[in-house]
Amino acid sequence: MRVAVDGMGGDHSPSAVVEGCVQALEEFKDIEIYITGPEDLLKEAFSKFKYDKERVVFIDAKEVISTNEHPAMAVKKKKDSSLVKALRLVKDNQCEAVISAGSTGAFLTGCTLIVGRIKGVERPALAPVMPGKNGPFMIIDAGANVDSKPSYLVQFAKMGEVYFKSVMDVNNPKVGLVNIGEEEEKGNDLTKATYKLLKEEKDINFIGNVEPREVSTGDVDVLVCDGFVGNTVLKMYEGVASTILSMIKSEVKSSFLAKLGVPFLAPALMNLKKKMDYKEYGGAPFLGVKGICVKAHGSSDAKAFKNAIRQARKFHENDLIGKLSEEITKKSFDNQKNI
């Protein structure tokens, strides 16, 4: 498998990106890395490590897209940027996947404009998988589409369902609509209309509305919402997780008795920290485009980047894009028959 990597994306590029690539090359013997960025700079960063030189291809790119640039304008103008060149590798079928920890807006825009949408997809969606009390869950959309239509959300539900079936091996994923109440009549015009459409979808296991306080249980596999709500829920969840871990750490240090209990609690606390750590999950797939596109966290370190590559590899092994294309095409055909 060939993976295109934006070598200049993220807060700790290129060092963390390069180290993550080296770790991935060591762990996964069936991958090749095509890394984009200033070639001399990238080669210097790689020179600090031992790695299989036969499996790394350097693609020289002189420009970098920063987070404060207008996404669409930057993607269109900076054709020699590390991000655009990485995306073009997937567009031109030189790579099966692309990963970037750079500007989210530019990445999502570039995926749509350069890689292109799967035929029949109205809007691609950002779909991070998060740790829950009873298992992982997906938030879709988590920020790609701030303004959405009911038909978009129904398609998000279908894409999320396909993901859980093919990647997570869940036979009948539960799909819920994020709302301010469980009752069908609750919410705004968007959620009310979406609820009716999802209820009519016989091939989606729609369990109804899900209140925000129930999001983190993991009892519902796919949580559907527009990008504004999804991004808010995602950032709130990350913030609460960080706060809880910080509070536990402070309480442990607060008294002598608490410190005495640390050796007994340490394994459980370490396991909790691992479950809540975004680095373990790598990145969020951008579902609905023709290639495997993974958005890594902007502050990703080497471990997070290695896990983003692991994710992309798993998506490829499970033919996620092929299965999404098949389902969306089938759904579009069924809709045409019913017109």
UniProtKB/Swiss-Prot annotation:
Which SUPFAM superfamilies does this UniProt record tie to the protein?
A: Isocitrate/Isopropylmalate dehydrogenase-like
- Record-linked Pfam families: FA_synthesis
Q: Quick one: where is this thing mainly located?
A: cytoplasm
According to UniProt, the reaction catalysed is: a fatty acyl-[ACP] + phosphate = an acyl phosphate + holo-[ACP]
Q: What do the Gene Ontology cellular component annotations say?
A: cytoplasm
Enzyme Commission number: 2.3.1.274
Domain of life per record: Bacteria
For this entry, the protein name equals: Phosphate acyltransferase
